[in-house]
Amino acid sequence: MGMWEEASDTGMKGKKKKKDKNEEEEERGKKERMVNLTLEMIYLLTGEHYIPRKKSDDGGALHAPGSVIQKENNKNDKKILELMSNIIQLLTGEVAIRTHHVSIYFSLDEWDYIKGNKDLYEDGMKEEPQQLHPLAVCEYKDESNVTAHMESTLGCNNDGNLTKMSPVEQPPPANGIKEEVASCEEINQSDCSINPFTEQIQGTDTPTPIMGCSHFKTKVNKYDINSYWSPDESGITKSTLHSKDSCNEGHKHLSHKSDYNKHQNPHKRQKSFSCSKCGKCFSNLTSLHCHQKTHKGKKLLCLKCGKCFATSSKLIIHRQTHMDKKHFSCSECRICFSKQSSLARHQITHTEEKPLASSECGKCFASLSELTVHQRTNTGEKHDFCSECGKCFATSSQLIAHQQQVHIEVKPFSCTKCGKCFSYRSRLVRHQRTHTGVKPYSCSECGKCFASSSHLIGHRQQVHMEGKTFFCSECGKYFLYQSQLVRHQRTHTGEKPYSCSECGKCFATSSQLMAHQQQVHIEVKPFSCSECGKYFLYRAHLVRHQRTHTGEKPDFCFECGKCFATSLQLIAHQQQVHMEVKQFSCSECGKSFLYRSHLARHHRTH
């Protein structure tokens, strides 16, 4: 028994060696055929002969110059295409089927199956060829005809009805070349040209590397077919075509699947990642994670001014405002910037066209998004709501400012004068100027000083701006923007277009309406007065109210020593009494005024 087993093992090993040797010879023969096919294709393209060297040589191929044989381009193109099909078959084991308009690649097993059942669809092939429908998802519902449907060169319309197809090309043998059955000669030669390397898509300047007929612009290849041979649960094979390289939105054809996916991104507007805190949606998970940091309590603190930021990148950008000197000033409004690029971006606001005007107030905007945000202030529409107290806001910036001022847990910076607390050091510094009277911002035109940069900008625009084109016919006051004029004219007409949805009270401006809703109709007012029991939304409002009971006047004027209960009263006093530059004087009595509107109001007394 042992001898028989040993002999059996020896025989098996011999068969295995013989099989390996046959495979090696077959592989060697395949490589030789590929080399021959490639050299023949080079000859057809260039008309020059190349002789392959043996392995002992330096490598490469010998160039045998010869006479260039002029042949018809169409014949050369056909033969080159067949050579390419043979090379593809040798490399991938796939057979190319070509119709008038489409190139489809099948594996050898699939091709054998189609050849074996050719009689099932031979009658359909004899019909007059019709044009292919654009590629779409095939939903053929009659399972009894699915096999025949699949074999009819995968052609169907959206309703599930079979489409008569043109004859398909038989696979050329690996060792020879036969004439192609489906050629472009059956179509007008001026409309169709086959080029195995490049094809110019209509509407573009550069050729696209696609192998196929240019008469019909939709291409199908191995990568275009999503699942064209997918058996279902019943074992019946259904065919489904998806043209992934043609965009359904703009009907654009792309050469690579990666280019198609990149091109499709702007068309995809689905935002499947939503924030559990505020409900805002995002298109990717990274954007959602960045957004969720704004809800977390952890903030990155600026050591200079105490301002907090959700991300380190925003903190780094903010730090540059402390480090850089602002050398670049705008010639229009005199605002200074630390970078030339920031100045250039700002100057666009003065020069760009603003074709979109608000129907309510006449203010113009450059983009539709800016107009939409502005119109919310006119209509009272509020999309952004606070998850803590439910308060709604017209813009996301207003919501963020509200959350930082009201709901932030830590307010480490407190005022020693009035006890008011702030979340940022910069706000504390700005607040303390109301007590000390420090005004670090001075106007270069008239020398007037201001406590904040926003007040200085407002002063320049109202007093020193030359290009004031909007004039009030009632009081003679000039305005830089039409929206400012419209808002000002309401003081003369008494118009109040903004009404409260709760009590119906009307207001002239949207800011007055918002202040009314916060003070009167908001449900949560945590700060109450111990004297009269009145409730307030903010601690600052409570402190200001308590001064009416105590008579405290912490804000005093450095010029005359007069005291005031609020900083607003102090500012109004300084402007009316101690302002040195009063440009507008009365011709009747010689009295001077700071603003033209005050002079016009004074003229009425004469």
Curated annotation (Swiss-Prot):
GO terms for biological process: regulation of transcription by RNA polymerase II. SMART domains: ZnF_C2H2. Residues 1-31, 240-271 are annotated as: Disordered. Its main location: nucleus. Residues 242-262 have a biased composition (Basic and acidic residues). Belongs to the krueppel C2H2-type zinc-finger protein family. It is found in: Nucleus. InterPro entries: Znf_C2H2_sf, Znf_C2H2_type. Keywords: DNA-binding, Metal-binding, Nucleus, Repeat, Transcription, Transcription regulation, Zinc, Zinc-finger. May be involved in transcriptional regulation. A zinc finger (C2H2-type) spans 273-295, 300-322, 328-350, 384-407, 413-435, 441-464, 470-492, 498-521, 527-549, 555-578, 584-606. The lineage of its organism: Eukaryota, Metazoa, Chordata, Craniata, Vertebrata. Pfam families: zf-C2H2 (PF00096). GO terms for cellular component: nucleus. One of its GO terms (molecular function) is DNA-binding transcription factor activity, RNA polymerase II-specific. This is Gastrula zinc finger protein XlCGF66.1.
